Amino acid sequence: MLDCLSIIERYYTPGNDDYRVLVHHSRQVADLAVALSQRLIGQGVPMDIEFVEEAAMLHDIGMCRTDAPGICCHGTEPYILHGVLGRQMLDSLGLYRHGRVCERHTGTGITAAEIIAQHLPIAPPRDLLPESLEEKVICYADKFFSKSRLNEGPKTMERARKSLAKFGGDTLQRFDEMVALFGTPDSI
């Protein structure tokens, strides 16, 4: 098992607010993603639980390079790039599979067409959609926890859907596909 906190501490200082936000949020996401994965394993679906936990702990590592003061991040890049930046950071450590999770967890994934239509600063435009079950379960679990409201606990299904609705029907369709795959978190 990777020592995820040591990896995080290459980029964040323990005790700082951004570290606290990242580690708290990532632990919430990891716990839910592991529980959902264990449920699938119980149904005979193979899942790499160790990888799910590691990648969930590292999925938002790129946020430190973004300008998102609401979650204690004072970098220079737009927040939408935190996944792409996280992938670059983890790729530089040889953690390519973990880096893919970073790049593909934003929203319910982002298509090249959405990048172009929304004029997102992701170049070159490409599909950044979760593909493996492990990528999808982390993306899905992430939708139930806010980095700006750490102490509120998991969002309800209704609140998770509402937070995604502003991104359009394709985003909600991908979310509904994840609900069908993983079930609802409140049923764990």
Role assignments for model-derived ranges:
Residues L32-A35, K143, E177, L181:
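Alpha-helical scaffold segments in carbohydrate-active enzymes
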Residues R27, D31, Y96, A180-G183:
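Generic structural signal for well-ordered, non-transmembrane alpha-helical segments
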Residues V45-M157:
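Divalent metal-dependent catalytic cores for phosphoryl transfer on phosphate-bearing substrates
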Residues M1-Y79:
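Acidic/His-rich, divalent-metal-binding segments that scaffold phosphate/diphosphate chemistry
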Residues N16, R20-V23, E131, A165-G169:
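Charge-dense, low-complexity intrinsically disordered segments
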Residues I7-Y11, L32, L85-G86, Y140, ...:
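A general alpha-helix detector
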Residues Q38, S146-R149, S187:
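Charged/polar positions within long, soluble alpha-helices
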Residues S163-I188:
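Charged phosphate-binding loop/patch that engages nucleotide di/tri-phosphates or the phosphate backbone
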